[in-house]
From Swiss-Prot:
Residues 57-71 are annotated as: Framework-2. Disulfide bonds join C45-C110. One of its GO terms (cellular component) is plasma membrane. Residues 1-22 form the signal peptide. This is Immunoglobulin kappa variable 1-9. GO terms for biological process: adaptive immune response; immune response. Residues 111-117 are annotated as: Complementarity-determining-3. Residues 79-110 are annotated as: Framework-3. Residues 46-56 are annotated as: Complementarity-determining-1. It comes from the Eukaryota.
Length: 117
């Protein structure tokens, strides 16, 4: 039985920075995907300017608060399954789910931590 698990993803996230600096835009791709249980899934987040490793990934399920998965681009938050991993620095980052599980149905967000409004 082919069990399809859709995962809606945030397409564009704009974060405003203080002072004279330009806004940093984060663009996630793909904007939507459909995958099977057991698949390897990769989500990309691109920043409009370098943010070193100051990036976090969140998972949000309907009716629930966002859950921190990864911070500092690649550090797994305590309690998060090891099938989740993050990589990248500068302007390009990836979130990988090595073997998709039914409970991974969610919306996934990247957030830059380089500066705050």
């Amino acid at each position: 039985m082919d069990m399809r698990v859709p995962a809606q993803l945030l397409g564009l996230l704009l974060l405003w920075l203080p002072g004279a600096r330009c806004d940093i835009q984060l663009t996630q791709s793909p904007s939507f995907l459909s995958a099977s249980v057991g698949d390897r899934v990769t989500i990309t987040c691109r920043a409009s300017q370098g943010i070193s490793s100051y990036l976090a990934w969140y998972q949000q399920k309907p009716g629930k608060a966002p859950k921190l998965l990864i911070y500092a681009a690649s550090t797994l938050q305590s309690g998060v399954p090891s099938r989740f991993s993050g990589s990248g620095s500068g302007t390009e980052f990836t979130l990988t789910i090595s073997s998709l599980q039914p409970e991974d149905f969610a919306t996934y967000y990247c957030q830059q931590l380089n500066s705050y409004p």
